[in-house]
Amino acid sequence: IDAEIVIELTPTNLKDGEPGLSHITSAMKYSKNVITVNKGPLSVAFPSLIELANYNGIMFKFSGTVGGGTPILEFAKRCLKGDRIVSFKGILNGTTNFILSKMEEGLTFQEALKDAQVKGYAETIPSLDIDGFDAAAKLVIMANWLMGMKVALEDVNRIGITQVKTQEVSKALEKGNAIKLIASCENKKLVVKPMEVSKLDPICVNGTLNSVTFSLEYAGNQTIIGRGAGGIETASAVLRDMIEIRENIINEKNWF
């Protein structure tokens, strides 16, 4: 294929990463730069994909896999590179955050899930979201890329939100807290589970918003908040990666 960039956008498969994994590896072997928003290949084979990209001297961009249009990975990798990330935690799945926000309004889990499905936030079979798989996949990508770990989905201690009761949500509210599905990386331990979070905590956002707080060795805590999903938002992430690859190609040509 006479192209400088291959964009891989097939549906996410968290079991074995296919067919996206084969698409990406084939493109890399033919020395094509690759962009993807597919979490599957990255959650099962991140270290080997980075190694293959480096071996073939190509650019591999995946900023849309975490946060969609909100540049969570880019923020951490670029803006925080003068410091050291000690740990991070946040809300990485907009669907579950929408459901838990609705439960704060008094809806049961099933009622909130139905509302999310009607609005198009949740799939007819919503297991990837409500059982924490989506958040875990994003956590794996962040841990590998930002913390230098070599982990896969099975390394995450994962609990979804299906057992969260409206009464628990109400009790948390009485204390000025909210129950959120929090993904965290601390002391090389990866956890996704419902947790009580203070309403005053910057990561305590509602609706379909995502949020991540990075704890730094010198600069304290830095938080990024934004919309985590959606067609236009994800498309903007692909465009962002395309622009960066284009700029790098132009710079290389000018250098020589």
Residue ranges and their predicted role:
Residues S87-K89, N97-L100, D115, Y121-T124, ...:
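Catalytic, metal-anchored helix/loop core of enzyme active sites in primary metabolism
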